Amino acid sequence: HLAELKGVVKTIPNEQILINTLSLQEAKSSSEIENIVTTHDDLYKENIMIDTNPASKEVLNYAKGLKMGFEIVRNERLLLNKHILLIQEQLEANKAGFRTQAGTKLINSYNEVVYTPPQDKDEILNLMANLEKFINDPEFSELDPLTKMAIIHYQFESIHPFYDGNGRTGRIINILYLVLQGLLDLPVLYLSRYIIQHKTDYYKALQGVRTNGDWETLIL
């Protein structure tokens, strides 16, 4: 299916229109996963005029982050931690960087702590350095790229390196990794709609690896 999509994209004369349209749709859906809700109408209006709707601004920041990441990957053929930091900075409009303070926990809808990510700043830096190598060094792992993408996504979300924007940054990394591997020429895969449709299963799959080592459900 990815090869089919890649072939179809090559027949479209104006890639910028396609990138702009699909990045806004992906941005809207990715943000909805984290309950940042806006309408397409709001987005297209905000794309051409200044407004103060915070939800629209967050979604537009996602679209800008995705496009910025795509340009980096296309030009440098790498996706390094310094690039991931730039993408998250675009999403959150701040320079907080990787977490340095303890206290971050993931809670469910009942306000119960379901996962505590690494708290020590040096451990976070070491884990992200390891992930950077896994993303960019083909000799580090010879797994199929789609399997690697699932592992990268799990590792990033479990390290949870930022104070905020981890989910959205992680979903941008998914798309950029497919571009990096040559499976996509443009960042036009609309992954977040699928996650919205299977949101409970998505979070269960991530948690299943943490609690039971169940990689199969996440990867498949």
Model-derived segments and spans:
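FIC/Doc superfamily catalytic core
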Residues: 1-220
